[in-house]
Amino acid sequence: KQEAKSDIMPLSMCVAMSQGYIGYDLQNALKEELLDRGLQQGVATVLTQVVVDGNDPAFQHPTKPIGAFMSKEEAEKMAREKGWHIAEDAGRGWRQVVASPKPLAVVELTTIRALAEADNVVIACGGGGIPVIATDHHHLKGAAAVIDKDLASELLAEHLDADMLIILTAVEKVAVNFNKPNQKWLDALTPEEARTYIGEGQFAPGSMLPKVEAAVKFAESKPGRTALITLLEKARDGIDGKTGTRIAC
């Protein structure tokens, strides 16, 4: 929950640092591209905190792998000496696992909205947002957690009243029976169809599953909203309806 003092940097601070250096590179790359196209448009990175519930069950059942891969012996040593929760990660080795609680509110929402409405490109909720717990007197305390970036992005899009949520990933479309002889790419999904596939275990946890869950939540949050999941390089074609998987009611 709230982070204990130790010789290891608090996880919330690690997320904040990640937001800073990723935002720095992304902001400059976007600005350069805009200028190359003759566009005088502002680009801003907002250090973003996301509120979670300190009583979220995720804190009792950490599942999010972070950090370096270790041997079983190394992992067990860290568990004994540092109190880490550890787990094997898809046969690739052992890693620390931390809580991944549900995002509840974006603290800097008003600032992000103001920047966007002033025609700025806004980079926000990096790494899922800095996890914080609201205490008495409106204080915010860093939490030992990593928030799912897809769910955090959905929450932000929903509260900004966006028409479309675009989730860019490493494949052009969502598939069922992925990497099997009977694999099938999906052009469109209703929330009901998506839930059926989720129930069948069609989408891998930590990979496509949170993307589909975020897309379903956004599509159902307000009539007329659509979510798109596609490949980064195919974003334009996806927006134009030429590729990608669309999730809508």
At which residue positions do the language-model features occur?
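C-terminal catalytic "cap/lid" subdomain
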Residues: 1-249
